[in-house]
Regions:
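Short, structured helix-loop boundary elements
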Residues: 11-15, 69, 73, 86, ...
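Signal-transducing coiled-coil/dimerization helices and immediately adjacent hinge/linker segments
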Residues: 262-282
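N-terminal helix-turn-helix
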Residues: 1-86, 90-91, 251, 255-259, ...
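Extended hydrophobic
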Residues: 177-252, 259, 269
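Amphipathic alpha-helical regulatory segments at dimerization interfaces
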Residues: 24, 40, 91-103, 109, ...
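Short, solvent-exposed recognition segments
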Residues: 129-203, 278, 282
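Amphipathic alpha-helical effector-binding/dimerization core
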Residues: 67-167
Length: 282
């Protein structure tokens, strides 16, 4: 391997490691200490320090002068805001989440898939005084763990479900032994039959959830909306009633997604046609 190829490989590895640290710190609302970043990343301390300093220089991370913890930076917020115009599922879902929280008085969530994991993007609080704290904005779980997460897993093709479960086998065994791959396969089938996912207090005792997947116009999984409450508020017939409300709101979100993609396609066609029109003879 020549020197150029070695330099390219080293540079690519540094980028991969830096983005891993950015994602790791960015998902912790309370920030992270240097020792915590070292422990969670599996990298040595000098490498972590060097990469964190590079991310700080870019504005993607910042370090608080008082507690010396690392937090997501302003530039990451700017980039996220710009990306929301193209990947604006939260913007398209805000009204539905607010409406669900008002109608049910329970906490409502929007989650998206990231590889073999699910990430909670938003938590909308309801007015019911007793709340469940199983899921917060920024929470990451293996795909299939939690109602919204299970709804997304169940919406995938069988071969993709198998690939996800294989990838998550170790973490499921270590952190969620009650949800072994075979048990999740069973729950995927049940979710497909009834049309919505249920978490009967498996992650946090007495904290139940119901979730429904959101699909792109082509049928792919865009995310999921879910509702969580204490177990006494999740029994039948209310469980089925919540599922109906979730289906109504996910349908509204899917219509908005379809309109967004249609508008984007129209603008693209118009942009391509303009130079062709200028070249046409008069």
């Amino acid at each position: 391997m020549d020197d150029v190829a070695i330099r390219d490989m080293t540079g690519s590895q540094s980028v991969d490691r830096a983005t891993k640290l950015l994602s790791l710190v960015g998902r912790q609302a309370d920030g992270m200490t240097l020792s915590a970043v070292v422990e969670k990343s599996g990298l040595n301390k000098p490498t972590v320090r060097r990469l964190l300093l590079a991310l700080i220089r870019a504005g993607l991370l910042e370090q608080d002068d008082r507690d010396r913890r690392y937090y997501i930076g302003e530039e990451a917020y700017v980039l996220g805001t710009l990306a929301s115009g193209r990947h604006g599922l939260l913007r398209l879902s805000t009204e539905s989440l607010h409406r669900l929280a008002q109608k049910t008085s329970d906490s409502c969530f929007l989650s998206v898939r990231r590889g073999a994991s699910s990430v909670c993007l938003h938590r909308e609080e309801g007015s019911f005084p007793i709340r469940t704290h199983a899921l917060q904005a920024g929470s990451v779980h293996p795909l299939g763990v939690g109602a919204g997460s299970l709804a997304m897993l169940s919406a995938l093709p069988d071969e993709e479900v198998s690939a996800v479960l294989e990838q998550n086998a170790a973490v499921l065994e270590n952190q969620f032994p009650m949800l072994a791959p075979d048990e999740l396969r069973r729950r995927v089938e049940l979710t497909r039959i009834q049309g919505y996912a249920v978490n009967p207090g498996l992650i946090l005792a007495n904290s139940w959830g119901v979730g429904v997947a959101i699909r792109y116009p082509d049928g792919g999984v865009a995310g999921a909306v879910s509702i969580a409450a204490i177990d006494s508020r999740m029994q039948e017939p209310r469980q089925s009633e919540l599922a109906v409300l979730l289906r109504q709101e996910t349908s509204r979100i899917e219509i908005k997604l379809a309109e967004q993609f249609r508008d984007r396609r129209t603008r693209h066609i118009a942009a391509v046609a303009r130079p062709l029109k200028r070249r046409s003879p008069r």
